[in-house]
């Protein structure tokens, strides 16, 4: 046993001696031109340093300062988080290395300060909390040259890093760290103001990161408008005037109007962007998890918007999981990508939670939860590329649209599914949409997709009376917004509940309470709607407008109830083809006491069977229907149980 131990010790000593023989202690900056393993024990200063391809450099007390390092497949070994590349750039690439941001001179000293008596109009807080620290712009630009082209690198930020606003960046406040053509990069554990742009990269993991803005979260005021910036407005009683003398009191279309752009709101640009540089390149294998994004224009972007999508490569194979988002100017998650999974993400205070845009297909959003939204999620494609938007779905998610995010002169929508591949169905399953408004708005399923299908969903609409006595309203609409090649788009609501709640009390000759339009056709010519359950409570007026321009409506095995609706009596302003089966209608209809308004068309077809109606319904149709086009079977008054045949 003792001899064996001596043998092992001798072998280990031999290996160490051989390794020592291979490792060269660097004497000067020009002594590393051959391939080898180099130990740097002192500071090396030079404008250019050539290191043999495939070499390894080990820092052991020294560092490199002010040099452009030329090396391919360079392995870097650092013992700790000290600065070893001081103002250096790499021409080449590194491999199989484990590095920290501080190895490149980045200072992890970002901190939060307070400024009292912040007088910006409309802000709910009087004290501004803003971030400051050492400007790491130059150091980050250097480290980006090391990560670009790298393979098998573990990169740890290990701290909070400030980056100053760059005047040349205009509205996009901080600079980006641009990393190109890297493979197998793991980036983790840090807080940044700067955004990161990955171009033509593969197998990228970003985890346990925080991407923040120049200010801590605050509810920035109205920042979008569809009007002209030349006129003054009021939002919640606060006056906003035309910007003069460099003041920033106005929102000009999408971008904040002021001398420093979005800096005045404390917003930073996108957190992370994954993109391509040409049609021949790709960005694949993306994994973003356990990250937080706040006070950004956007959070995670998979592929940037283009004027010509034929000039881009593919962004594909992305997972965004267990991430949180707060206070975004546009979308927490936006994409022009394929084969994407978004899972267990949450956020608040944003224009729109998720944008599944042009070129996006095979996208699954599951377990998303967002509140304080102005819009719901969106699938939308440029018409010329509609055939590349397909097989997208949202599951087990919830979205609350409550207009805390002010947009002047614009309506909201619950879901925008504009354009998609003909024959494809955009599916929303096991999800809840909540809509709150005390002003006006449209809870819209806005579609030009060939088919949109809601399964086991809940659509909740809550209307509040305004303090000035005027009437808020909601239009529950399914309509075509853009020209489409699909000839008969269809919206299906399967086992889906609709709840509309208001504070109803009507007075003679005047309607001063919330009212709702249901399924109104706004520009739509052909539609199919299949409804499960709809409950309307406390509204002074209801117009259920399934217009004749809609091709087909099917209501089956449903519970339809309307309460406190004293103005309008039609349940259904019928489409060309109406089928009602196994359905119960409850609630007082009011003025007209009629279930269906017969359309003024020649080739309509209506069928009502195995259905019960409220006692207030005296007849099914406003005019005697043409029996050649109408079938009534087993329709009864739910109170008297008597049949209704006309």
Language-model features and meaning:
Residues 34, 44-56, 64-81, 112-119, ...:
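Extracellular beta-strand-rich solenoid/capping regions of secreted or surface-exposed proteins
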Residues 3-8:
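Sec-dependent signal peptide recognition
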Residues 41, 60, 72, 102, ...:
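Feature marks extracellular polysaccharide-active and adherence modules
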Residues 29-31, 35-37, 43, 48, ...:
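Detector for repetitive beta-architecture
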Residues 66-70, 164-173, 192-200, 214-223, ...:
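Short glycine/acidic-rich loop motifs that flank beta-strands on beta-rich extracellular proteins
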Residues 20-31, 92-134:
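Right-handed parallel beta-helix/beta-solenoid
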Residues 11-18:
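Hydrophobic h-region of N-terminal signal peptides that target proteins for export
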Residues 87-96, 630-646:
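Extracellular/surface-exposed low-complexity segments
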């Amino acid at each position: 046993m003792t001899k064996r131990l001596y043998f092992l010790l001798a072998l280990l000593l031999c290996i160490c001696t051989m390794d020592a023989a291979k490792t060269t202690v660097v004497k000067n900056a020009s002594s590393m031109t051959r391939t080898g393993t180099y130990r740097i024990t002192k500071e090396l200063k030079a404008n250019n340093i050539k290191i043999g391809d495939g070499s390894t450099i080990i820092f052991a007390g020294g560092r490199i300062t002010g040099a452009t390092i030329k090396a391919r497949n360079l392995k870097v070994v650092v013992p700790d988080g000290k600065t070893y590349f001081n103002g250096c750039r790499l021409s080449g690439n590194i491999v199989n290395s484990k590095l920290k941001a501080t190895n490149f001179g980045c200072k992890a000293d970002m901190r939060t300060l307070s400024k009292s008596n912040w007088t910006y109009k409309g802000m709910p807080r009087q004290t501004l909390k803003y971030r400051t620290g050492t400007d790491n712009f130059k150091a980050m630009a250097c480290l980006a040259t090391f990560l670009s082209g790298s393979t098998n690198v573990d990169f740890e930020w290990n701290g909070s890093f400030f980056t100053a606003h760059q005047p040349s960046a205009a509205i996009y406040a901080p600079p980006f760290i641009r990393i190109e053509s890297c493979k197998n990069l793991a980036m983790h554990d840090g807080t940044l103001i700067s955004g990161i742009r990955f171009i033509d990269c593969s197998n990228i993991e970003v985890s346990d990161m925080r991407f923040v803005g120049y200010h801590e979260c605050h509810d920035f005021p109205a920042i979008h408008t569809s009007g002209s910036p030349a006129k003054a407005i009021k939002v919640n009683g606060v006056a906003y005037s035309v910007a003069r003398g460099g003041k920033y009191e106005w929102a000009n279309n999408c971008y904040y109007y002021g001398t420093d752009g979005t800096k005045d709101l404390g917003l930073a640009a996108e957190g992370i962007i994954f993109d391509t540089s040409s049609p021949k390149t790709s960005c694949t294998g993306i994994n973003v998890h356990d990250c937080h994004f706040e006070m950004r224009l956007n959070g995670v972007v998979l592929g940037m918007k283009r004027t010509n999508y034929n000039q881009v490569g593919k962004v594909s194979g992305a997972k965004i999981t267990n991430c949180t988002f707060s206070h975004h100017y546009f979308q927490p998650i936006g994409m022009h990508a394929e084969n994407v999974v978004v899972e267990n993400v949450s956020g608040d205070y944003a224009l729109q939670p998720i944008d599944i845009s042009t070129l996006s297909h095979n996208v699954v959003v599951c377990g998303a939860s967002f509140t304080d939204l102005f819009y719901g999620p969106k699938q939308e494609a440029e018409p010329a590329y509609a055939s590349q938007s397909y097989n997208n779905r949202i599951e087990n998610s919830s979205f609350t649209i409550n207009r805390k995010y002010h947009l002047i002169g614009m309506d909201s929508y619950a879901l925008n599914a504009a354009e998609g591949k003909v024959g494809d169905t955009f599916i929303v399953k096991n999800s809840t949409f909540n809509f709150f408004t005390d002003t006006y708005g449209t809870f819209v399923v806005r579609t030009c997709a060939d088919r949109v299908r809601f399964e086991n969903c809940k659509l909740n609409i809550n209307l509040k009376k305004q303090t000035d006595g005027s009437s808020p309203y909601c239009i529950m609409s399914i309509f075509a917004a853009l020209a489409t090649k699909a000839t008969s788009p269809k919206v299906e609501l399967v086992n889906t509940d609709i709840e509309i709640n208001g504070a109803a009390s009507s007075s003679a000759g005047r309607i001063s309470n919330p009212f709702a339009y249901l399924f109104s056709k706004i520009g739509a010519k052909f539609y199919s709607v299949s409804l499960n359950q709809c409950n309307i409570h406390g509204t002074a007026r209801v117009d259920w407008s399934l217009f004749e321009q809609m091709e087909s409506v099917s209501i089956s095995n449903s519970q339809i109830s309307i309460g406190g609706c004293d103005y309008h009596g039609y349940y259904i302003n019928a489409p060309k083809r109406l089928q009602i089966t196994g359905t119960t209608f409850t609630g007082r209809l009011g003025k007209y006491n009629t279930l269906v308004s017969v359309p003024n068309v020649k080739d309509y077809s209506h069928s009502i069977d195995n259905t019960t109606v409220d006692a207030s319904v005296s007849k099914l149709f406003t005019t005697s229907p043409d029996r050649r086009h109408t079938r009534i079977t087993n329709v009864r008054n739910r109170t008297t149980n008597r049949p209704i045949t006309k």
